C-alpha cells in the first residue's frame, strides 16, 4: 500500500467516525438517546455475573487516569531515551488533547451520571461523553500500531491491532456494564477517539514523511 493510499484511508476513517460522533451529538441534543440507553442498561443487567463484574472492573482500570498517566509517563521517558522522540511526542499529544477535549465537552453538556446500579465508585465528573471511551482507545491503538510496525517480522505482529481493538471495545462497554455511563456517552466518546486515532496516524505519517525527505532515514532512530 503506497503512502497516498494510506493517507486517504486515514482521512476516510477520521471522516467516518467524525460523522458518527456528530450523529450521536445530534441525537443527544434532540433528546433521542433514551431508547438506546435503556436498552443497553437492560442488556447489561441481563448479562451481569460475579465473573463478569470482576472482569470488567479490571478492564475499566486500564482505561482510567490512575493507570494511563503513569504508563504514559514511563512510555514517554523510555521512548525519549531510546531516541523514539517522535513517538514520545505523539503519546503526549494523544492523551493530552483527548483529556482536555473530554473535560471541555463534559462541562459543556453537564449530563448527570446514571443513578441506580453502580458497580464501581461513581466518578464526580459529568457523564457525556465517556472519558474512558474517548481517551484510552486512541492511545492504545497508536501503541498497537507501533508495536505491529516495530515487530513486523514476528508472526504475532498481525494480531496486535485486532486484539487491541477488541480490548478497547470491551473497555468502552465496561462503563455501561458497571453502571457509570449511558451507552450514548460511550458511543460518542468511542467515535471521537477513533476519529482522533486516524488523525494521529495521518499526522504521524506526514511527520515521518517530511523527516525522510530531509535526512537519510536510520531504522528505529528518531
Segments from the language model and where they lie:
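N-terminal transmembrane-helix/juxtamembrane module of multi-pass inner/ER membrane proteins
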Residues: 1-67, 107-109, 113-120
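Alpha-helical transmembrane segments of integral membrane proteins
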Residues: 10-14, 86-94, 156-163, 188
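Alpha-helical transmembrane spans of integral membrane proteins, capturing the lipid-embedded, hydrophobic core
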Residues: 18, 91, 95-99, 190, ...
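Aromatic-anchored segments of alpha-helical transmembrane domains
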Residues: 20-23, 96-101, 166-176
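Membrane-water interface at transmembrane helix exits
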Residues: 25, 41, 102-106, 110, ...
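Membrane-interface loops
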Residues: 34, 82-152
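Hydrophobic alpha-helical transmembrane segments
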Residues: 62-81, 137-143, 147
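Membrane-embedded catalytic cores of phosphoryl/pyrophosphoryl-handling enzymes
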Residues: 119-222
Amino acid at each position: 500500500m503506497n503512502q497516498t493510499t494510506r493517507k486517504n484511508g486515514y482521512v476516510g476513517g477520521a471522516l467516518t467516525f467524525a460523522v458518527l460522533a456528530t450523529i450521536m451529538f445530534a441525537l443527544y441534543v434532540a433528546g433521542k438517546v433514551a431508547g438506546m440507553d435503556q436498552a443497553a442498561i437492560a442488556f447489561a443487567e441481563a448479562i451481569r455475573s460475579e465473573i463478569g463484574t470482576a472482569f470488567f472492573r479490571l478492564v475499566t482500570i486500564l482505561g482510567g487516569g490512575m493507570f494511563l498517566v503513569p504508563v504514559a509517563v514511563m512510555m514517554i521517558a523510555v521512548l525519549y531515551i531510546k531516541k523514539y522522540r517522535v513517538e514520545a511526542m505523539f503519546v503526549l499529544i494523544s492523551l493530552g488533547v483527548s483529556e482536555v477535549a473530554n473535560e471541555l465537552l463534559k462541562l459543556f453538556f453537564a449530563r448527570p451520571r446514571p443513578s441506580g446500579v453502580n458497580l464501581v465508585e461513581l466518578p464526580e465528573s459529568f457523564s457525556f461523553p465517556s472519558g474512558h471511551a474517548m481517551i484510552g482507545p486512541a492511545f492504545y491503538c497508536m501503541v498497537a500500531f507501533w508495536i505491529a510496525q516495530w515487530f513486523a517480522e514476528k508472526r504475532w505482529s498481525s494480531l496486535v491491532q485486532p486484539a487491541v481493538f477488541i480490548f478497547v471495545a470491551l473497555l468502552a462497554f465496561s462503563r455501561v456494564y458497571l453502571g457509570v455511563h449511558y451507552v450514548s456517552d460511550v458511543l460518542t466518546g468511542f467515535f471521537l477517539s477513533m476519529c482522533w486515532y486516524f488523525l494521529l496516524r495521518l499526522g504521524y505519517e506526514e511527520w515521518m514523511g517530511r523527516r525522510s525527505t530531509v535526512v537519510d532515514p536510520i531504522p528505529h532512530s528518531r
